[in-house]
Amino acid sequence: MKIALVTDAWLPQVNGVVTTLVELVRELESLGHQINVIHPGQFKTRPCPGYAGIDLAVRSRKILSQKLDGLAPDAIHIATEGPLGWDARAYCIKKEIKFTTAFHTKFPEILHAALNVPLAWGYALLRNFHKPSSGVMVPTQGVLRMLDQRGFRNLRSWTHGVDMSLFAYHEQPTIHPLLGVLARPVSLFVGRLSYEKNIEAFLQLDTPGTKVVCGVGPLGASLKERYPLVRWLGNLPRDELALVYAAADLFVLSSKSETFGLVMLEAMACGTPVAAYPVDGPLEVLGQSSGAALGGALHNDLLTAWYRALAVPRHEARNRAQVFSWTQATRMFLEHLVPVRSVLPAGPD
């Protein structure tokens, strides 16, 4: 099957959406499908305001239309609500062909945190974007329910996975040269240093040991100045990041707006338990068993979650991560695709 994947988030960007799409493409190609990714690197771009490292396509509609005409795909999936997403949406509507979309990021929460834009405005815009979609893929049941309550339709559950080979299990936290001889326990945060990540909830925790942060973002300079005792590592290659996960005693997800939170799965695959708030992504990833989280701890008080997660055996974190696989996620994705005009081919071209 020929699939056109249109996305504003792609390499060399570093974020969970890019990771998800790269893994998806790899799995689809391994099944024999032909995937054509249309991304900002194929167009003239401009930096995204306030988000260094993210470039957005400009004046792309004509070229994008030509690409899709030339590809003649069996299915079109629009992964993001950026400029390329809107252009692909317009193309499909004009051609009267069906397409699917995905909801990866709570942009209304980001705009609200950074610029105080009312949440209702942001969700009205996204509801309009996804309205003509034949299937809106969402990563968790919590997000699905939230979008349903906000008037989104044609919602489809699409979970994610983790590379269990890359993020290898370690029974005990390892020693990593980037971390030196740090006071234990080592608490790790991985993510963009931006408003919506709520990172200061992590940095302000009164905990023993050392805090380590991997990531860059618009708040980076001010945070480094205000929290000099934190070990700041910047962005790391994924193979290096896997080793840092393995060296941590626990992982802290301070964000309250994660739709999924792949970084949690990556940490847990290495055996590092997670402390997080009981919100959409963490509730899905950590799950609940008799009221207790699996592979970590959830609590409205992040400090309480931190202490509880520290007591979680590393093998329990690994076991929970194994529930999620990219193979399963890819099967779900294929089930949710819709043909542009007629019946989809059953297998690869």
Regions found by a protein language model. Give the residues of each.
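Donor nucleotide-sugar binding/catalytic pocket of nucleotide-sugar-dependent glycosyltransferases
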Residues: A124-Q172
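Nucleotide-activated donor-binding/catalytic signature segment of Leloir-type glycosyltransferases, i.e.
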Residues: A221-D239
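Short alpha-helical donor nucleotide-sugar binding micro-motif in glycosyltransferases
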Residues: L68, H130, L243-A248, F333
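Short hydrophobic beta-strand element within catalytic cores of glycosyltransferases
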Residues: P273-A276
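Aromatic "clamp/platform" in nucleotide-sugar-dependent glycosyltransferases that forms part
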Residues: K256
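A charged, aromatic-enriched C-terminal amphipathic alpha-helix characteristic of glycosyltransferases
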Residues: A311-P345
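Conserved donor-binding/catalytic core segment of Leloir-type glycosyltransferases
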Residues: I175-V212
